[in-house]
Amino acid sequence: MKYDLIIIGSGSVGAAAGYYATRAGLNVLMTDAHMPPHQHGSHHGDTRLIRHAYGEGEKYVPLVLRAQTLWDELSRHNEEDPIFVRSGVINLGPADSTFLANVAHSAEQWQLNVEKLDAQGIMARWPEIRVPDNYIGLFETDSGFLRSELAIKTWIQLAKEAGCAQLFNCPVTAIRHDDDGVTIETADGDYQAKKAIVCAGTWVKDLLPELPVQPVRKVFAWYQADGRYSVKNKFPAFTGELPNGDQYYGFPAENDALKIGKHNGGQVIHSADERVPFAEVASDGSEAFPFLRNVLPGIGCCLYGAACTYDNSPDEDFIIDTLPGHDNTLLITGLSGHGFKFASVLGEIAADFAQDKKSDFDLTPFRLSRFQ
């Protein structure tokens, strides 16, 4: 049997691609080395931020706005436990922060609903937050957070119900190209398709060693908090930059635990066994202390944490391109720790590729050729 599309890696982007391509009427095979959602990639830990006024550059804004529409659609499948929670996101940092300047520029260019507050305004609205006098806050009312594992579980279930074939707990060991299309090799045998999408995340270089992707071990942790820090008390999700440039992100508390992580830093790794569990690196439990001590002093001790991986490109922008020399294989990789919010739209882009549809987006900034 020859599929229209084989998806290699069915975590964030792959789960979305499987659903959107199957819904479009294609004969699709989703594959994964594990059983998604799982703990081996970049999607576990329950929640991920979604920000619209994008500090990483305005080129992402059209993508994230379409992503939001798709997240809203997906949330309707889980109305009791919605996948998207519109908590708002407060971006905190020094008034001269480059990241915040990019947030403001993105908001202005795309007429997004962003409110600017000075230090006193921030602390008046959220008394739990402490910032220096030279800090500002850019509050995105319409942003919030996503339930990442629930999203993947929902896409996989919807794809299966729509007739998608799924081969999980079965690593792809090689990809071959010939005049008839693409063949993947697995322990379960070989499978053929007209087209393939490679969104294998952290260990994509096991299949395609020439790709400029560097895995980095990252951690996030949950700290003791109370109802003041919850969505019910209108406490927002947040990003925060310290005076030394370190970037943090976090979420409203749930079940008396507030989740926070540090975006920069981490440990460069070269194999899966180097991604040791949380607390096996001495700094894991204390990584968020500088932010908590200065910005959220009412938060208590570390309760538990988890390790994940970023698949970093050299410039930390995404790689969305066909495999050089093989126009029937699309790469979506190098998401560099800020990709989950885009999973819905990237899955749709992958489904369009499989149908030979031209993308609605300018993907030029994400081409591999920028590294040559």
From Swiss-Prot:
It catalyses: N(alpha)-methyl-L-tryptophan + O2 + H2O = L-tryptophan + formaldehyde + H2O2. Pfam families: DAO (PF01266). The keyword Cytoplasm does not apply. The modification S-8alpha-FAD cysteine is found at C308. It comes from the Bacteria. Its cofactor is FAD. One of its GO terms (cellular component) is cytosol. It is an enzyme of class 1 (oxidoreductase). Belongs to the MSOX/MTOX family. MTOX subfamily. Monomer. PANTHER family: FAD DEPENDENT OXIDOREDUCTASE DOMAIN-CONTAINING PROTEIN (PTHR10961:SF7), PEROXISOMAL SARCOSINE OXIDASE (PTHR10961). This is N-methyl-L-tryptophan oxidase. It comes from Escherichia coli O17:K52:H18 (strain UMN026 / ExPEC). The lineage of its organism: Bacteria, Pseudomonadati, Pseudomonadota, Gammaproteobacteria, Enterobacterales.
